[in-house]
Amino acid sequence: MPVRSLSSSVVVWPDRAAVESALRLWAEEAARIPELVRVGYFGSYARGDWGVGSDLDVVLIVAGADLPFARRPVAWDLTRLPVPVDSLVYTQDEWRGLDPASRFARVLAREVVWVWPPGERVVA
């Protein structure tokens, strides 16, 4: 979360590099769970226009899921990250089935920065 300087009233919010590094470390540990297929982020941190109070929008792709879409994020503890997190958890089939004509799918296609597996750039 934010860090207050001891000699100032200025609040310093974690920058993109710090947040991405923390997410990469989280993803490496979470990858021990075989259902996890991909981890990425989008939104203000991906676009570079984050600021004090910005959250991290995370997308997780999993092999399959028993929980309904709205309840899946509770299964993934992202509280160790240095900023608040809003997460979306899609199965591979749901991710592939996103309507490419929808505004949200276009935003995801344009913005998602994949951090796991290493070197991953796109999800087919």
Predicted region positions:
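Catalytic core of pol beta-like nucleotidyltransferases
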Residues: 1-38, 47-52, 62-124
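Short beta-strand->loop micro-motif that forms the acidic, two-metal-ion catalytic signature
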Residues: 58-60
